Amino acid sequence: MSQKIRIKLKSYDHNLVDKSAEKIVRTVKATGAIVSGPIPLPTHKRIFTVNRSTFVNKKSREQFELSSFKRLIDIYSSTAKTVDALMKLELPSGVEVEIKV
């Protein structure tokens, strides 16, 4: 097989992303493939500003922030055993996984 696999992880909780990346790296290294990463990608922050009051007091506002954390993992010289191990791997439900071969 021996192809490059790129895995992108995305979540709103940085602990989930880090634990999932560590789990993937451990699994891939156990199969004998070469791993590059996890590489932290820039954090995307969305800030929402809303009025505290519904009618008056425009100067009184509140801000909310939604941060998304991303990690990138590259796998080189993968085998069929590596792909099978990745398919059987269970990750938390709050993590979005994108795999490119």
UniProtKB/Swiss-Prot annotation:
Keyword Ribosomal protein: yes
Pfam family, one: Ribosomal_S10
Keywords carried by this UniProt record: Ribonucleoprotein, Ribosomal protein
BP-aspect Gene Ontology terms: translation
One GO cellular component term noted in the UniProt record for this chain: ribosome
MF-aspect GO terms: structural constituent of ribosome; tRNA binding
Transmembrane segments: none
The organism's place on the tree of life at top rank: Bacteria
SMART domains: Ribosomal_S10 (SM01403)
InterPro entries, A to Z: Ribosomal_uS10, Ribosomal_uS10_CS, Ribosomal_uS10_dom, Ribosomal_uS10_dom_sf
Cystine connections: none
Entry keyword annotation includes Ribosomal protein: yes
Role of this protein: Involved in the binding of tRNA to the ribosomes.
Family: Belongs to the universal ribosomal protein uS10 family.
HAMAP family in the record: Ribosomal_uS10 (MF_00508)
Protein name: Small ribosomal subunit protein uS10
Lineage per the UniProt record: Bacteria, Pseudomonadati, Bacteroidota, Bacteroidia, Bacteroidales
